Amino acid sequence: MIRVLLVDDRADFRRAFARLLERQPDLEVVAAAGSLAEGRTQLSGVDVALIDRGLPDGDGLELIGELRAVNPGARVLVMSSTAEMRHPTEAVEAGAEGVIDKLDDSERVFAAIRGTGA
């Protein structure tokens, strides 16, 4: 079972995406947060963190280093809109395993989560 932390500021997206993830037999959403502050309280006990870049209280990339300090084995996928996908190197340089497009096909997102090696 891959334990997932979902950090996105849009509550409707978080709920819908969490439901999609929970339908997968090997994925479990163990925490969801809408801001950096909330995300910081949920960093332990996750295998993969899906982190949005544009959070109301800062850049989601800030959580990557904090996650690594608390949970060194966790993997990170940064979620981004299509426009932000033009510069994925920032996320990878910050320590993410990759970047996924929020609007991408759900099967591709599931494959990316599974492909992190978590």
Predicted segments, located by residue:
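Conserved acidic segment of CheY-like receiver
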Residues: 1-12, 17-21, 49
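Acidic, metal-coordinating helix/loop segments flanking the phosphotransfer/catalytic sites
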Residues: 32-48
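Acidic catalytic/metal-coordinating carboxylates
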Residues: 35, 59-62
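The feature encodes the CheY-like receiver
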Residues: 56, 84
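Short amphipathic alpha-helix used as the core "switch/output" element in two-component signaling
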Residues: 61-73
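C-terminal output helix
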Residues: 86, 104-117
